[in-house]
């Protein structure tokens, strides 16, 4: 069982540990997700933990495996068998100097030291990424072209040739868009519109070279629109 908590700058002890809630005119203690995970022996997933403020330090004793004392109700909660804590972070708690992950913060070093191991997740291999896309799209050749395109862009990014990357998530967005419009050019274009014009054009030009069946130089035909009947 996994209990997932999406962390933001506003996340505090009340959100995590719990607090009193007004129920039918009375104040009633309500466990937060951390206590629920502790008592059920579940996996606690702290998602995007580097978005947190220093209020996240209320988890110190829990990360040490000692449980937590709920001072507001005078109860100590020990972790049930199987309880564990995982956290995800784009910056490993070091913040984002280049602004790519704006909103992330530098986390307390003592807090970070309480996580014994860190796993770095790189992009999937080409074969794995193809399998992911093939689950969502029947056009296997299109999936292969997309994966090759994304792989080239990432290599160019790491070499300093471009300032953005195409993530696996972005490729998934494209095949989902393709399932809607049945048009490769449109699916790719609407999914790279989020990038600045220069980067977008560079990505489209590169895909032109990867897939001979696609041409972004021409106009994409407009979608037929239903005729509206205006009442007289």
Spans of model-derived segments:
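C-terminal regulatory/interaction module of P-loop NTP-utilizing enzymes
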Residues: 1-232
């Amino acid at each position: 069982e996994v209990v997932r908590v999406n962390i933001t700058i506003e996340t505090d002890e009340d959100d995590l540990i719990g607090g009193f809630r007004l129920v039918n005119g009375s104040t009633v203690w309500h466990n937060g997700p951390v206590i629920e995970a502790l008592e059920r022996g579940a996996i606690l997933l702290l998602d995007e933990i580097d978005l947190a403020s220093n209020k996240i330090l209320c988890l110190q004793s829990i990360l040490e495996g000692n449980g937590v004392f709920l001072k507001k109700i005078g109860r100590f909660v020990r972790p049930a068998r199987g309880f564990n804590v995982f956290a995800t972070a784009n910056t490993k708690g070091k913040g984002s100097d280049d602004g790519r992950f704006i909103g992330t913060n530098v986390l307390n070093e003592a807090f970070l030291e309480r996580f014994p191991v860190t796993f770095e997740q790189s992009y999937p291999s080409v074969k794995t990424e193809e399998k992911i896309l093939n689950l969502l799209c029947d056009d296997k050749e299109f999936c292969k072209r997309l994966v090759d395109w994304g792989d080239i862009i990432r290599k160019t990014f790491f070499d300093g040739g471009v300032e953005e990357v195409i993530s696996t998530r972005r490729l998934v967005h494209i095949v989902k868009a393709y399932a809607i419009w049945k048009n490769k050019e449109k699916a790719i274009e609407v999914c790279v519109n989020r990038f600045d014009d220069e980067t977008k054009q560079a990505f489209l030009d590169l895909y032109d070279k990867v897939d001979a069946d696609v041409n972004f130089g021409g106009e994409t035909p407009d979608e037929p629109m239903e005729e509206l009947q205006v009442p007289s």
